[in-house]
Amino acid sequence: MGLKRFKPTTPGRRFMIIPDFSEITKTKPEKSLVVPLKKSAGRNHHGRVTVRFRGGGHKRLYRIVDFRRWEKENIPAKVASIEYDPNRTARIALLIYADGEKRYILAPNGLNVGDTVMSGPEAEIKPGNALPLENIPVGTIVHSIEFLPRGGAKIARSAGVACQLMAKEGNYALLKMPSGELRKVHIKCYATVGVVGNEDHKNEVSGKAGRERWKGRKPHVRGVVMNPVDHPHGGGEGRGKGHHPQSPWGVPAKGYKTRRGKRASDKFIVRRRNG
């Protein structure tokens, strides 16, 4: 996995940095593991905009990725290909299990075509293998972690991220999240060893607005150039906001805590990400 830089032959290429896709071994997805994906353009089931500045973009097929690795316990699988997935920042790996079933998983760093992976309590500690946290040594780097046993992987699934297993106490393991938060997770929860691949994603630069439009992202209009009816920053003579920066719905934009009150899971947070 590397990055491509371009000579400034056009304004759009001057600062463009994109992946070279050298790790991709297959361009067409496995037909049995894709389903149609309908565009929402940022609208919910009422047709109202819930995410602004979304719409258009290239057609996509959704790749069904296996986040429930415990379903194939103790069945070895061979990596058939590493593929691009337009629906996420990470790459995906196509596995062919010994029983003939095919599944996609997130491709961790160091996983190559021809490698064998396994899930289960007895699996070896190597990238791509999935085990319960109770069977993983302290200090190991892991990703695709479940919040609840048999709940499916929810934590650390983006390109280049991982958690570190810091300790085990009773029925809980202490994990250091990518954000720096220390959190307790039940030791029966499954996690996959290694760091999610495509680590250079954070260094990519689109270079031009059109590349963002291909992804379905529309121009992000500033509130200060809107009318008063559309945004608290709108209107007025000149460009002054007139008051504290805030969202279109009046929520302060700087230094305001937006996490809603107490919740049952608070007891599992040992240290917040901001200390």
Swiss-Prot record:
It holds the Pfam family Ribosomal_L2. Keywords: Ribonucleoprotein, Ribosomal protein, RNA-binding, rRNA-binding. InterPro entries: NA-bd_OB-fold, Rib_uL2_dom2, Ribosomal_uL2, Ribosomal_uL2_bac/org-type, Ribosomal_uL2_C, Ribosomal_uL2_CS, Ribosomal_uL2_dom3, Ribosomal_uL2_RNA-bd_dom. One of its GO terms (cellular component) is large ribosomal subunit. One of its GO terms (biological process) is cytoplasmic translation. Residues 230-240 have a biased composition (Basic and acidic residues). It comes from the Bacteria. SUPFAM superfamilies: Nucleic acid-binding proteins, Translation proteins SH3-like domain. The keyword rRNA-binding applies. Residues 223-275 are annotated as: Disordered. One of its GO terms (molecular function) is rRNA binding. One of the primary rRNA binding proteins. Required for association of the 30S and 50S subunits to form the 70S ribosome, for tRNA binding and peptide bond formation. It has been suggested to have peptidyltransferase activity; this is somewhat controversial. Makes several contacts with the 16S rRNA in the 70S ribosome. NCBIfam families: rplB_bact. Part of the 50S ribosomal subunit. Forms a bridge to the 30S subunit in the 70S ribosome. PANTHER family: LARGE RIBOSOMAL SUBUNIT PROTEIN UL2M, RIBOSOMAL PROTEIN L2. Belongs to the universal ribosomal protein uL2 family. This is Large ribosomal subunit protein uL2.
